[in-house]
Every structure is written in C-alpha cells, then in structure tokens.
C-alpha cells in the first residue's frame, strides 16, 4: 500500500470521481505513514544516476511555468490534447507533481564546478536497484544553490521528457487564474553533453 504509483494509477476501469478519490486516499496513506519527511525551506537537489559505467547528474528543483511561456523552456514534440487534459485534471485534483520534467541545458563549466562542489557533501540517499541502477541524492548547500539559480536565470533548456506534463501544468496554471500555487513544475536539469537516454 505504501507505493507512490497508487497516487498516479489511472485505474481506467473506475469512474473519474472514484479514480480521483482512490489517488487522494493513496497520497493521504503515504503522508499518514510518515513516508515523506517535511522540507521546511526551499532547496535544490542533485540526483545522480549510474548505470553500466555511465553517470549523469541532474539539478532538481522548481521550474517556473513562465519560463515555458516565454521560451526559456523549449519543447520539441507535439502533445495530444486528451492526454494533456487528463494530466491537468489529475494535477488539479491531487495538487502535487508526480515526477519531474527532464530538461537538458548546454554544457557549462561554471555549473559543473558547482555541482562537483555540492557533491562533496554527504548524500541524503544512496541506493542501488536490483537491475544495478545506482541512485544518489544530495541536498545542495544554500550558498551553492544561490549561485546555480543566478546561472540558470536566463539559460535556455530543452524538454527531453515530459511534454504532456509541462503542457498540463501550464493549463492548470491558467485555470487557477495564474495563482502562485500552480506557477511551478518539478524539473530535473541534465547537461546535454552528458545525457544518456535509452528506448529499452
């Protein structure tokens, strides 16, 4: 019962209202069980994936929906309206993002140096799956995070995965009257020169 997939499961055999209720109940169950610790202050995180000798590290944090609207976040795929609407309704009802949009940015030595500096701290999570995919997470120290935010302020990024989620988030932001609550989406930013994707 303590698996986040229950929060995002479509359960297409159920009516929409029942699906939403089941998703909300699954989320409440996770919170009640203490599955997540509360982060009181805003923070950036590093998420590193290591598999078969390849290592890539993402900067994880909130991305402004305005950056998508003004062209700093650049899509390269068309989206299907019904899929984006389905995700928008889910986000509106659940109120949280289920997974980050993956973004790529042009290689940057200054960014890489700050990432390496942040990785000198103790990771908050470090584990390996049965398929040998190793995952490590660090909280970025505030002084390093401030420098990263400045470097990314006007940097263009490209959507690698998550076009429908980005579209859905923009829709919900509009529906809400562009309120602060829905003005951001969770993003994972990878250096394009180190990015590895697999169709498997």
Task: Identify the function of each model-found stretch.
Residues 138-184:
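Active-site beta-strand/loop microenvironment that shapes enzyme catalytic pockets
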